[in-house]
Amino acid sequence: MHIHTRQSFDCLSDPEAVLERALARGLDKICVTDHNEIDAALALKARYPEHVIVGEEVKTAERVDVIGLFIHERIPKGTPARETCERIREQGGLVYVPHPFAGGKGGGGRILDEIGDLVDAIEGFNARIHFRRLNERAVAWAKARGIPVGAGSDAHTLAEVGRGWVEMPAF
């Protein structure tokens, strides 16, 4: 539920190559969640609407990441976390918190107290997190609150595409 393209500052992967790799690995949809940008996701969705969910991984004012899924307007980097969640919801999107307990980018879970009531799903497995306990903490936090748990590759290279996924009925 969380993948990047070359529109992210830390990824060089062509958007179409990312989708091709995902389809080759048996995934039928990808959530393109570039850092603070949505143009590549929108363009890919326009060409392959049945395979792409538009998202954005927003670096909030608190320096933690919040993902908006099913959005159509970019949310500026540096927007406060609570406002980011509200702006996602205003677009009819879902608030998804990636790697919530990973030090710098997740803030060690500290932002969850502030935005927990606005969270639609939390990333309980991130394939790029090497410390299992960080994923386990996310799952425990979500379960204690009855919040759905997602998973993702957080792919920044083509080789990482498909290392984490969510199985669900087609929609």
Identify the function of each model-found stretch.
Residues 96-104:
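Aromatic-lined carbohydrate-recognition surfaces of secreted/lumenal glycan-active proteins
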Residues 18-36, 93-96:
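Divalent metal-dependent hydrolysis catalytic cores, especially in the metallo-beta-lactamase
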